Amino acid sequence: MARKKFSGLEISLIVLFVIVTIIAIALIVVLATKTPAVDEISDSTSTPATTRVTTNPSDSGKCPNVLNDPVNVRINCIPEQFPTEGICAQRGCCWRPWNDSLIPWCFFVDNHGYNVQDMTTTSIGVEAKLNRIPSPTLFGNDINSVLFTTQNQTPNRFRFKITDPNNRRYEVPHQYVKEFTGPTVSDTLYDVKVAQNPFSIQVIRKSNGKTLFDTSIGPLVYSDQYLQISTRLPSDYIYGIGEQVHKRFRHDLSWKTWPIFTRDQLPGDNNNNLYGHQTFFMCIEDTSGKSFGVFLMNSNAMEIFIQPTPIVTYRVTGGILDFYILLGDTPEQVVQQYQQLVGLPAMPAYWNLGFQLSRWNYKSLDVVKEVVRRNREAGIPFDTQVTDIDYMEDKKDFTYDQVAFNGLPQFVQDLHDHGQKYVIILDPAISIGRRANGTTYATYERGNTQHVWINESDGSTPIIGEVWPGLTVYPDFTNPNCIDWWANECSIFHQEVQYDGLWIDMNEVSSFIQGSTKGCNVNKLNYPPFTPDILDKLMYSKTICMDAVQNWGKQYDVHSLYGYSMAIATEQAVQKVFPNKRSFILTRSTFAGSGRHAAHWLGDNTASWEQMEWSITGMLEFSLFGIPLVGADICGFVAETTEELCRRWMQLGAFYPFSRNHNSDGYEHQDPAFFGQNSLLVKSSRQYLTIRYTLLPFLYTLFYKAHVFGETVARPVLHEFYEDTNSWIEDTEFLWGPALLITPVLKQGADTVSAYIPDAIWYDYESGAKRPWRKQRVDMYLPADKIGLHLRGGYIIPIQEPDVTTTASRKNPLGLIVALGENNTAKGDFFWDDGETKDTIQNGNYILYTFSVSNNTLDIVCTHSSYQEGTTLAFQTVKILGLTDSVTEVRVAENNQPMNAHSNFTYDASNQVLLIADLKLNLGRNFSVQWNQIFSENERFNCYPDADLATEQKCTQRGCVWRTGSSLSKAPECYFPRQDNSYSVNSARYSSMGITADLQLNTANARIKLPSDPISTLRVEVKYHKNDMLQFKIYDPQKKRYEVPVPLNIPTTPISTYEDRLYDVEIKENPFGIQIRRRSSGRVIWDSWLPGFAFNDQFIQISTRLPSEYIYGFGEVEHTAFKRDLNWNTWGMFTRDQPPGYKLNSYGFHPYYMALEEEGNAHGVFLLNSNAMDVTFQPTPALTYRTVGGILDFYMFLGPTPEVATKQYHEVIGHPVMPAYWALGFQLCRYGYANTSEVRELYDAMVAANIPYDVQYTDIDYMERQLDFTIGEAFQDLPQFVDKIRGEGMRYIIILDPAISGNETKTYPAFERGQQNDVFVKWPNTNDICWAKVWPDLPNITIDKTLTEDEAVNASRAHVAFPDFFRTSTAEWWAREIVDFYNEKMKFDGLWIDMNEPSSFVNGTTTNQCRNDELNYPPYFPELTKRTDGLHFRTICMEAEQILSDGTSVLHYDVHNLYGWSQMKPTHDALQKTTGKRGIVISRSTYPTSGRWGGHWLGDNYARWDNMDKSIIGMMEFSLFGMSYTGADICGFFNNSEYHLCTRWMQLGAFYPYSRNHNIANTRRQDPASWNETFAEMSRNILNIRYTLLPYFYTQMHEIHANGGTVIRPLLHEFFDEKPTWDIFKQFLWGPAFMVTPVLEPYVQTVNAYVPNARWFDYHTGKDIGVRGQFQTFNASYDTINLHVRGGHILPCQEPAQNTFYSRQKHMKLIVAADDNQMAQGSLFWDDGESIDTYERDLYLSVQFNLNQTTLTSTILKRGYINKSETRLGSLHVWGKGTTPVNAVTLTYNGNKNSLPFNEDTTNMILRIDLTTHNVTLEEPIEINWS
């Protein structure tokens, strides 16, 4: 609670009073003599000594010589003021000023103190009379004779006390520590030496002779109101005493004064005395851990002075000196002994450990309700709502505000109904005023009657102060009557408001006026001769008068016990209100032993970063003091917090033992949900409070051990790692018990913490991964929503499935986290009871377990079980961290019974974590869980992937492991050792936008001899480009290497925000690796922390684990399924003129994959590298990239769905091209047309058969001798034919190969202009063309058909040059040749570019000899076709030079795979420049981003059944690769097709985006018109369906052009939550709504298909098929393909025609497929179908359709294209409309309503509506309603 706000008058009076006080003190100092400064009062706090000092001594102390005056051991003789020589002389001390005022100028010498007289041995120690050495007095009333007694209480505990033998002085009436009566012990860990003249005492550890406590350093001063003793300590490492703000856990020895006197004072950057009175400190002696503690049992005001050496001096204002010295072998033992002395901590109720919300001044109950509501809604784990004094009526205890908090009892019931608790505040001060309604205040009246108040010095008049309710009296909680009254008041109020716990505040005791309403008497109690360095230097400042009387004594003596006594009284009250329950007590003021009764918070802190940091020290100090349930006000009490501060504090506060968010009046709310339901603060708070609740069984067990054994809960690091001196100063991190290390972020704007990691094995709590750190300081990256949590190896942690309250979570299954330590062992324990009954431990009503792990066996041993209700709970999960080998078997046994196999377990190799689930190990029984560990073959990473066969000798020479496997195993026999660590991480720098790390080659570990020499220094850059996309790049920072010159669409600077990022990245060490983790699931989705990483000049290798076996992509290589086969398969990638075949690298190069994760999320990974490579897939699951050059430049896309991940990839590589509308029509081609007549004959046959058909091609046979830009003799009339069919709505596409003949005897402009413009690929550093041979024939050569292929090439093929399409001049030259051919020779509408891998019919060059073997035969040759024949096989030499557009020279070695890509954009641009239309470009060779410029066909396939399903795989893969316009040669390219195969392929091919029938020369015709009428009819029907659906299909093409994504869509993209779809590849979707299920097997008339979980309609009939979420066998007659429309979608259609020119003029139709709720949506994109960039220029029509029950509406989103003849709506077909008959259909259009004719099939729920006569066009909105 905050300080009172004083009025101006009050402030003026206070200032005046302070001035007067200062003057008075000055006078006292000046007049200081033997006579007391004030009159004595008759009933002194101590009986006056028999002998008093009445005269000044005649001599002063003799100063030591300078050599014997080490300044750090000076004991100050004038502690209360600035010293003067005169005062020093009066006190008989040595005056020797120094150049630093911190060092005493006046200090004691040997003339002060006491001498020993008559020392005797007693039954429990020694006893001696001490006589004062005659010397000047300091503060008067010295006691000349005192009694010194010692007690050897235990082997570890020694007590000595110094009292007045003649007069009883005040001694603390501690309620637990009683007078020791023996027996004594003889075998102690300590010796005690007493020096006699002068007296001093030494406590010495026997084992090493080290002096622990030595008072010889200074004199004993013992007067009535001033006691002083000093001790030298053996170590500089001192911890404890309080309550003050120390900032650091280890005490600063630099002349620090720490006053102790309980005070209502908020913590600050000063030495102010605060709320508690704690005199215990601990000192660690050395790295053996030996430590000791010192406790002074004294409650009077005092100060403790700490100075170098070190020396501790006590200056106490009364009572006695009563010291306890406690010895331990460890710091933890010392604290245990202290707690056993003053009282072990209370066992909290389980719910006390839940999170609490509070604030001062909610203002009304409605506000409290809103706070509770929003935090419930945010899912914040939250057990307790607290209200401060604002709930009270006029701040009076035991009342509530009936206006602002009306309904409070009902609200409390709501909390209870939700499993939550309610805690109220009670202040001790009781108002003497009346209630708001004028009635008497019953609480006050009953207290008066029972005489329960603290009285004035007369002992009978209640002292009156002022607190929150105004004028108040103060209960005397040391009075038994008061305790009864207090308990009764608590009980009465509980009957009205059923609170669950009590928060007692202001109990220092606090008053807002000094002393009382009457002031305070001038006497030695209110104005003692010595006042410690307390705030205001006034004893009764902000409290009551020191001469006030309580049952235990004068306020002067018992003031600091007020909170202690109130806690004891409140404990008794709780027992009355909650019989036999623990409840909850939170106190602000404390004393030694308060932890037996109450928890404590650190008071009214400030919302500042430094106070958050200091809270850790405060918490650790109270752990020493025996109050483990402690915490600070999370987010700060005073001042406005900030989101960042509060977020970081919530992270820390989630691990305070007492976790409460509380703030003050007048500031913004700071409960987590106040910051927004989706704020980073809420997410982070929810995450870490969820972790807290998960760990509550562990935390509760720690409290059990604190309660029974005195162990600390929030534990200083030094308590566990005392051998390491670095731990002695750690106070910005702490432990829970021995096992959980908590490292918060404590600095504003920081995301990296310099953290010390002690000497143990540590695991990241959240991932379970083992950390490489040990006994070192690290820069721990902790971004905005993270706190460091690490589990210590060697410990077993009990956990429980969390919930939002402990009421709920306690019912959930339990689990264990086993963090394996040294030798793979671990231990732990677990305590469980009902969580609320008092004394369950003492009564034995609990369950106790011990856990241990060794030899791969977990023993779960129940050592006590007497809580029957608890046995319904069970350990359901066991998570074992640090298992380096795979686990293949788990076995479980109960009570030493035989082991049984347990199958529900998973091993996470990335994190080396075994998770065993579904165990059902009920509490109360013993169990054993056993697992095996094997180094699985699947964990082998191939060390010898080379082309030659591996042998054991070669393997061991390489430094790898050789082990043969079974005959069936495909695992490598030569593999990397698991410890392979090729590179070490020199440094890793984390920032908000990425990571930079430097790697150094480990030459000492570089025994792995890979194919080429390694690069010694590497750099890793990770860039968080977007929230869902990141890049990680590994390169040589000292030498620029080739990087792919393909432009990508990535932000120039990262635009991600930490809070919204979907991923976290970590650089791993030993070995180096990168781990990327999906935040939402914690799943590691990239993990290259594996052996085998290599970065050589011509060999780069990196492996990564995969999150599942479901991976798709990589190409272009023929695959047998859409999902990759991970059974040790390697696929090479290097563009080659290679017809598709299993594992044969083919035309394109696409190093991209998409992976599904076990949770159903998806991500994509793209490696931007264009060098030859291969990728190995293994069942780990894992993959390994090997590439022969460039760098590693990865991009990852986080999805989280397959379609979204694909869109994210397309966003980077560019959205797919928008084809012309006509390009979606059916197309015909073949290689081998003899002349134009054959083409004409085909065309006429198709038209006669009325088979829809849009595009005709000719292959290279139309050319003269296969020369580009020529027309052969047999095709001289081709241009006229093309003009004719184009006039009939057809389109024409020609083929162009890149190879340009250089052997022409006549003018060949293409070559000649190419030479002039320097466009051809050349040998490096020369002007010579690198010649090759492809299709062009030599002029004037007769082809000998009998020659072999190679002989024919040599004999008849011309030398050809390859254009270098990287050059700007080449693009210009290419465009000119295309334009000239179009304008001068023949028209065309699209271009087909082939042979652009680039393909050559010779190896490298015309001589078959290249000039650089290192490039053509690299040290490592990827697993490619013709692996031993060199990279130049059937292409050009790798050393050929190409020139990028910026003039950079590059090797063909690096850019070979970019050749087709480099040709596509120039071809696309030239086509559009030439025709002025959109057109289409079809390319055989492709690279990522190619889809921006054109389409792709799947190459020269075979007329075989197995090539049909592979075409679906290929299309779906190219959909991932960003090329939506794809298809295969329908009916097959090679070999003669056959009737049934071609039938089924025509049915399938009708739904390829690129639908072309194409075959090779010298095989039979296979066009639809070439078979028979039945075939023609089938083709006509199926193509009519395609043409009908073209508006829908075109709209889908637009969607992915605008937004990325897939048109040919795998089922898993839409139905990823249905696991069967993950394997489906013989079906596919058009967009989201149209499913195609072809027949892919010969001579069958059924097809087995998976029907996803949605409503589906048979396209042919419109009927609901009534099947979903299962496999189904469908009929499929020879002329039928199964097509289904998904419910919930609207498909725009159009009547078909001969070609799209005519179909676009037909009526449109809408297929409305209703979902289960009679809802559906769809859209139409429409433009002129051929203009360039219509979408980009807004020249299009966009219509949105919606079905809502019985009403269909359209909404015009864009009206940039209007052609009413193309968009006339002719009909509407509603499928699945429902069973209600339709009586009427109404059209609302252009403001008019009209009835429409309709036809209804009620049985099949189909409604057909006719609009043909109403001239409705889709450019205007429509509404159609049926009823």
Swiss-Prot record:
Localization per Swiss-Prot or TrEMBL = Apical cell membrane
- Catalytic activity annotated for this protein? Hydrolysis of sucrose and maltose by an alpha-D-glucosidase-type action; Hydrolysis of (1->6)-alpha-D-glucosidic linkages in some oligosaccharides produced from starch and glycogen by alpha-amylase, and in isomaltose
The record ties this protein, via CDD domains, to: GH31_MGAM_SI_GAA, GH31_N, Trefoil
For the region Isomaltase, what residue ranges are annotated?
A: 110-1007
User: According to the UniProt topology, which residue ranges lie Cytoplasmic?
Assistant: 2-12
Report the Gene3D superfamilies cross-referenced here.
Answer: Glycosidases, glycosyl hydrolase (family 31), Golgi alpha-mannosidase II, Spasmolytic Protein, domain 1
Low complexity composition bias: residue spans: 45-55
Single biological process term from Gene Ontology: sucrose catabolic process
Q: How does it sit in the membrane?
A: Single-pass type II membrane protein
Q: What residues form the membrane-spanning segments?
A: 13-32
Give the region (Sucrase) as residue ranges.
Answer: 1008-1827
- P-type domain: from which residue to which, for each copy? 61-110, 932-978
Q: Which residues lie on this side of the membrane: Lumenal?
A: 33-1827
Q: Which residues carry this modification: Sulfotyrosine?
A: 237, 239, 391, 400, 667, 763, 765
> Looking at the record's lineage, which domain of life comes first?
Eukaryota
Per the Swiss-Prot or TrEMBL record, the active site comprises 505, 604, 1394, 1397, 1500
Give the record's GO CC terms.
Answer: apical plasma membrane; brush border; extracellular exosome; Golgi apparatus; plasma membrane
Q: Does the keyword Glycoprotein apply?
A: yes
Glycosylated sites: 99, 437, 455, 823, 855, 904, 926, 1235, 1303, 1340, 1354, 1403, 1535, 1572, 1675, 1748, 1763, 1815
Query: Any idea what job this protein has?
Result: Plays an important role in the final stage of carbohydrate digestion. Isomaltase activity is specific for both alpha-1,4- and alpha-1,6-oligosaccharides.
Assigned protein family: Belongs to the glycosyl hydrolase 31 family.
The record's section on PANTHER family has: ALPHA-GLUCOSIDASE, P-TYPE DOMAIN-CONTAINING PROTEIN
Describe the protein's quaternary organization and the partners it interacts with.
Answer: The resulting sucrase and isomaltase subunits stay associated with one another in a complex by non-covalent linkages.
What is the official name of this protein in its record?
Answer: Sucrase-isomaltase, intestinal
**Taxonomic lineage from the root:** Eukaryota, Metazoa, Chordata, Craniata, Vertebrata
* Name of the coding gene: SI
